[in-house]
Amino acid sequence: LEKSWNKETYAYFMEMGTGKTKVLIDNMAMLYDKGKIDGALIIAPKGVIKTWYEQEIPTHLPNHIENVTVLWQPNITKKQQEKLESLFEIETALHILVMNVEAFSTEKGIKFATKFLNSHKVLMAIDESTTIKTPTAKRTKNIIDLSEYAKYRRIMTGSPVTKNPLDLYTQCYFLDPYLLDHASYYSFRNRYAVMKSMHVRGRTIQVVHAFQNLSELSDKLQDFSYRVLKEDCLDLPPKNWIKRHITLSKEQQKVYDEMKKTALATLNGKVTSTMTVITQLMRLQQITCGHFVADDGTTQEIK
């Protein structure tokens, strides 16, 4: 917090459980108290926006800060519209808008976020910033376009690199296009990746063969980011994995084998089928737990 609170751009690369959410909210509070901001736009995955709204902000935002906090909803009812309009009232309050990252693929979400950014001095933060790692994604482009209207920008994630170091480019570009000294993704890729040509179905494509200059990239990141690992700050015992072997009932085994072999199983006249491997694995897990969800939505118990 000491390193980042007054910087226009910063990255919290802190693993889960090391306090990055509290650090960001404390940062918001400090900037508000200093008169630097009067608004905050929190962008998070759909699965955690309610946690931000219902738990994190009420728990960690200091009590002395008057705030108006609104959770974005795609279906705007009259009541929801009143809540959204409250973000433009009470001039002395800290106005906080929590939006899911998917909203930035919609015209409605972009339009309201633009209005909010133009109406306040805003800190714009992305929780789990790997959600904008794909340069060609519509939401990535829209969020980056909107970032120029924010006075302060923050990104947060425990794993800034999910597949390869190239994931860092758009996350850092959101903060500032010049932080990594590359104005385009392709120049960045050419600096830190070795490409090779592959022939696929009559076409020639470029794929990553290896990486290079990673120590240089790491040095650049240190200027505007803070990395925290669980092992550095939490006294946790090592994970203890226990294998448990469980015998399936005859009916379970029959349904399990059907699903495993054909991706389709029948019980009590109800059929469950799968179209993808991940769904098939989920169905197999359900069967081992003594039930499965049929294609018509009913749950069938397996004895």
Locations of the language-model features?
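Substrate-gripping "pore-loop 1 plus following alpha2 helix"
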Residues: 111, 117, 131-146, 302
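Conserved helix/coil segment N-terminal to the catalytic DExD/H
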Residues: 77-96, 101-120, 134
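Conserved P-loop NTPase motor "coupling/switch" region that bridges the ATPase
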Residues: 38-40, 54, 59-70, 74, ...
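Conserved Helicase C-terminal RecA-like lobe
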Residues: 5-9, 18-19, 23-45, 104, ...
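Hydrophobic positions in the central parallel beta-sheet of the AAA+
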Residues: 12, 97-99, 124, 153-154
